[in-house]
Amino acid sequence: FQKMNILVPLDQQMGDFNDVAGQLLPSAMSTAMVKGSYYALALNTNTKILFYNADALAAAGIEVPKTMDEMFAAIHTLSGTNENGQQVWGLNEPALAGWNVLPYIWSNGGNITDDACTTATGYVNSPETVAAVQKLVDLYADGEFTGFNSGDIPMTDGFGTGRYAMMLEGPWKTAELSGAYPDVAYGT
């Protein structure tokens, strides 16, 4: 639409644009700029954080992971079965389609494209990117990482009942947990 010149720059149409934009994160607002003009307001961002079951980590003698390697080691240690013989997964990720896989790739030093988003070859197939994706495949194959199948335990319920020891999710999950599982001891 921008190439067709049918979009109207918000910063030229809104008298209070600078006041409104000044209340938003500059990094998020940078995604709304095209050729020196703003065409949108970045009203929300999506930050993923690690939620961990504090009791599960304590029982396993594990410190809160601070690196990806520590997180992968914790996933392995926390996976298995509970006292009722039910499977426990070290990590739940709601989906790895699209952008959800990117934090794993970026944390491993990989990327999908060059900075200009014009070239994928050499990035999406870089050793760092491939290794990050392979690690997720291995965790799934070993039963340490939840699947993406119909009938999987919903994220909040799995975490709240101890079937998922850790999860990567946004800060909105705290409201869900406090409402549905107020007695679960967890950290972020």
Place the predicted regions along the sequence by residue.
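Stable alpha-helical elements in mature extracytoplasmic
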Residues: 6, 10-13, 53, 67-74, ...
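Glycine-centered hinge/linker elements that transmit conformational signals in sensory
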Residues: 75-77, 118-148
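Extracytoplasmic/periplasmic substrate-binding proteins
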Residues: 103, 134-188
